Amino acid sequence: GLGDVYKRQLQQEASRRLSFQARRTMKTAQELYEGVEINDMGQTGLITYMRTDSLRISDEARAAAYDFIRKKYGDKYIPDTPKKYKTKGNAQDAHEAIRPTHPEVTPDMVKASGVTSDQYKLYKLIWERFIASQMSNCLMDTVSVDISANGCNFKATGYSVKFDGFTVLYEEAKDDEGEKKNVLPPIKSGDSIKVRNLEGNQHFTQPPARYTEATLVKAFEETGIGRPSTYVPTITTIINRNYVERDGKQLKPTSLGEVTNQLMSEHFDKIVDVKFTANMEKSLDEV
């Protein structure tokens, strides 16, 4: 969900939506955090600290988000109870989630101040996701449609939107086109439907896709490897040492990487075990 607006999701969403590599995302986030020149405000830090895996936001920030939502979209887009997102157990919660420091400063205002293209794009992403995370849910009905034509039966399944909620502002990007929701238009029993075209598809079971920077960062978090502050340096290091190379957006092991992995697995199996790193992080937290 939208609650993970923050931490590794920043790197993932910037990769999916903006085609930013993780290093570029964190460099730009650092600039937004340290401050840029904004019209009538001077040098202004636009986002909170970005090396955090917290999902917590302050009551003041939530109130500022509600103020904007109410003026722009109306009361029905404000949820009945405030949305509070839980941070995972191994997360460091010293800072708030990554959010705009001044929610009233819209992306258009930032753009008009002459910031760089990267700064504008990343701020827009953070700002829209933060505002959307505090909006009402999108309500959808699951729909199954049976269609009969010339004695042949066809079936379509998908969703119809009852209330757009936060999606009026923001929809989460997906790595895979197939993940996107199949939204069907409003139809009722007995309606006639025009056939635009017929397409025959044959599907084969696909092997798992190679990691992109975004999906690798997600895997780091899900398995408990590292912290948001170490994700980018880790990826950069394995590329710089020629263990991994980029193939478009995907990351693939080099022959050196494969040999290194084989030797490490044979002789240092505990160290390359994913659980070893996660448990080490947990043990360090408990000290």
Give each language-model segment a name:
Residues 1-287:
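Core catalytic DNA strand-manipulation module of type IA topoisomerases
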